Amino acid sequence: MIEWKIFVLIFLTFHMKKLLAQEIPLDDSPKMFDDQYKGCRDKMDKVVPGILKSEMQSNKEFKDSWEKASQSWKLIKPTMKLPKNFQNEHGIAVIAYTGNIYEAFNKATRDVGASSKNYKNKYRFKAMHYYLTMAVDLLGNKKRSTLVYRGVKSIHFVPSNSSGRVIRFGQFTSSSEDIKVAKNFGTASFFKMQTRYGANIMKFSKYPNEKEVLIPGYELFKVQLFKKQTHEFTLVSTGKTKNLFNCAYFKALLDK
């Protein structure tokens, strides 16, 4: 009986280590919803208020998060210097993301995969994604790079051999200007990055001490250095973007 328990313990330990050591490749074409809305932003501005209303009615978690963020936005907006064309909904979307909704939002964004049908029929954050994309685009300073860090627990990322050591995250990705803050989130994989498209959202955040910079999933990075033993990356923005989807909402209307 003791020998059997020892065998089971060894077996479980071995497989747990394999699971924890699982490596996930990063490349330049992750299958996630990553629309930049190029060429259709004016059209989206007209239809997205209706989309937002519908999604709030059908998604209580999102409704509660959006309404709470809306109240916070009313308080902090007068204290902020905002870029031209920055709408209330942009600010609300950023605040909502820094709250508790980001987990459900990111999971839904990943679950779309590369499927237009999934986006059309299952994605419940169409309005949130649009407003957040516009907010990050307006808040970002593309003329200069910002040094940020990102720590991840439980996942070992590696650069894919198929993408020429150029990668992107595919979804909105949080990072920090403070290396200590980033390491508090994990060190299973660790990123040191120079971002050109990331937006400093510290003043919007529920946790301003985290000095958060939000990186859009479409930004391309060159892997300058990767340490396999520690899964540490040094990434430099290429200054370019790439996305699988564009103007997906209007293309979905044409699909039957």
Question: What would you call each of these model-derived segments?
Answer:
Residues 15, 34, 143, 147-152, ...:
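Processing junctions and N-termini across compartments
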Residues 22-43:
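Short N-terminal segments immediately surrounding and downstream of signal-peptide cleavage
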Residues 3-21:
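Cleavable N-terminal signal peptides of Sec/SRP-targeted secreted and luminal proteins
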Residues 106-114, 238-256:
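C-terminal helix/juxtamembrane-tail motif
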Residues 163-245:
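ADP-ribosyltransferase catalytic core
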Residues 42, 46-195, 199:
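Internal glycine-rich, Lys/Arg-flanked active-site/core loops of soluble domains
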Residues 14, 135, 139, 218-221, ...:
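Generic recognition of well-structured, leucine-rich alpha-helical segments
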